[in-house]
A protein has these predicted regions:
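Short, well-ordered beta-strand elements
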Residues: 14-26, 47-50, 113-118
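Ligand-binding cleft/hinge of the Venus flytrap
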Residues: 31-44
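A conserved helix-loop-strand patch within extracytoplasmic ligand-binding domains
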Residues: 89-122
Length: 122
């Protein structure tokens, strides 16, 4: 509390700091730009933007290190006891996301029987 010689005491409002993890990729940059640049109401919070690749964010989420974070949807099965999914903010779509790379072409039916290597540990 402070008194600026006005004859009354004014309580200083301190913003609550929250860590917000997301990737530096263009889709996340677009989603968080307004918040990062102070162009939208922050709701009285002070967000510390943590920019890291999605695997690192998955690992940090598994340890509960960040208040809010982007994760891969697969990782949610491992961290659902620590975090809740928000109703918006997903970055998914047809033709977007992981690609299957092979030396030769395969049909969808053939792909179902193949062993596929996936990056990351989750």
């Amino acid at each position: 509390m402070t008194n600026w010689g006005l004859g009354r005491t004014v309580r200083a409002v301190e913003k609550r700091k929250l860590t917000l993890g997301h990737s530096p990729d263009p889709d996340d940059a677009f989603m968080f730009y307004g918040l990062a640049k102070g162009l939208v109401d922050d709701g009285g919070f002070d967000f510390e933007h943590i920019l890291q690749d999605i695997q690192t964010l998955n690992e940090r989420a598994s340890r509960g290190e960040l208040d809010i974070t982007a994760i891969s949807i697969h990782a949610y099965a491992y961290i659902c006891g620590k975090y809740a999914l928000l109703p918006s903010g997903a970055s998914m779509g047809d033709g977007y996301g992981p690609m299957l790379v092979a030396r030769e072409a395969f049909s969808k039916e053939e792909i179902a029987s193949l062993r596929i290597a996936v990056p990351g540990t989750m």
